Amino acid sequence: AGPDHWHSTIAMAAARAGKHVYCEKPLSWTVPETYMVRQVIKETGVVFQLGHQGRQTDCYQKAEEIIGNGLLGPVNLIEVCTNRNSPNGAWVYDIIEGSNPNTIDWKQFEGDPERIKEYMDYMTSNKLERYIGPDERSKFSLERFFRWRCWWDYSTGLSGDLLTHEYDAVNQIMHVGIPHSATSSGGVYFFKDGRTVPDVLQTTFEWPDRDLTMLYSAT
């Protein structure tokens, strides 16, 4: 699978070529890309599926059955977490020995220039300039190549890589859909390695019409 910043580009190219698409989560790198993918899939008429492997997990299907039959009574609070507790779990992956500019196509990794421009414009318009690295993007970096999940320039962070699994599981079990509100906090509190993506995240989701709150935490 490609890095997050390539997902929508590949999905749209495949759809325009008339290919049905199975896209690993996350669907996109930015919010605008999400709508772009939706439009292209609609226009081309191909079959599209977003991949969450948890959909095949027996315990989630059993939980849906139990809650759906009312065996637990009203559910008002959901708590889920992702705790990795190791450098590898926090995306500090090994750098393959001998890797260099002659063995890695950096421009190809960086992605479509138009997508990059749209990303820069999106981040700037949302006053998130401090999280982007326009200077670093043009510089070859083994850390960024092998550990790309640590930078917003290529990644969707804890939410796009890990929370997405937990949220999909909850949605599969309880059919919660889109929440009324979501509030997050966190930061880069442990891995002081230059990353821009938080290594600690707390998110609260609210569904007032269902008297339901979901708490998510990740480290």
Model-flagged regions — what are they?
Residues 6-9, 32, 36, 55-58, ...:
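Extracytoplasmic/secreted proteins, especially bacterial periplasmic and envelope-associated proteins
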Residues 62, 74, 79-83, 88-219:
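Contiguous beta-strand/loop segments that form the cofactor/metal-binding neighborhood of enzyme cores
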